[in-house]
Regions:
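S-adenosylmethionine/decaboxylated-SAM
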Residues: 1-169
Length: 169
């Protein structure tokens, strides 16, 4: 795929995606994952240790919008892949940071943006998460540095999907 070795994950929860990402980057790769909730970070840390991948994962606890400037200052980018699965209301800011910490070819994935199928395309729906998902999709479409699309998923959890974009310059 994109042969990512340096990955940024925004939103860790229990570390399920983190474990898959850490396996994918291989022994020489690194995943930096940002989690707001210390309890979730502890659960993720335990799961990552159980998976014997702790040497590939750096868990940072706190608000992602506070952690991202520190990551930039520490020059830990550019990242090959940025996976965003956190508070939907800040997705546009997370994509801005993903762009700032990227290089041409970086893949940016924003999870859970389809929001029940037709909800995102319905301007009469006033739910904050739906409005945030709509905003990030519009941002990706308008950003000249990104080529992206939304992909719908349907399964036992219902109708949702994700946006995937590639940095082109």
């Amino acid at each position: 795929m994109c042969l990512a070795r340096n990955v940024l994950e925004i939103g860790t929860l229990g570390g399920y995606s983190t474990i898959w990402l850490a396996r994918a980057v291989g022994p020489s790769g690194q995943v930096i994952t940002l989690e707001f909730d210390p309890t979730h970070a502890d659960v993720a840390r335990a799961n990552i240790e159980r998976a014997e991948l702790a040497d590939r994962v750096d868990i940072r606890v706190g608000a992602a919008l506070d952690s991202l400037p520190l990551i930039a200052k520490e020059e830990l980018g550019p990242f090959d892949l940025v996976f965003i699965d956190a508070d939907k209301e800040n997705n546009t800011e997370y994509v801005r940071w993903a762009l700032a910490l990227s290089h041409p070819g970086t893949v940016i994935i924003v999870d859970n943006v389809v929001r029940g199928g037709g909800h995102v395309s319905n301007p009469d729906i006033d739910d904050e998460r739906v409005k945030a998902s709509r905003a990030v999709l519009e941002m990706i479409a308008a950003e000249p540095k990104l080529d992206g699309t939304a992909i719908q998923t349907v399964g036992s959890k219902g109708w949702d999907g994700f946006a995937v974009a590639v940095v082109n310059e």
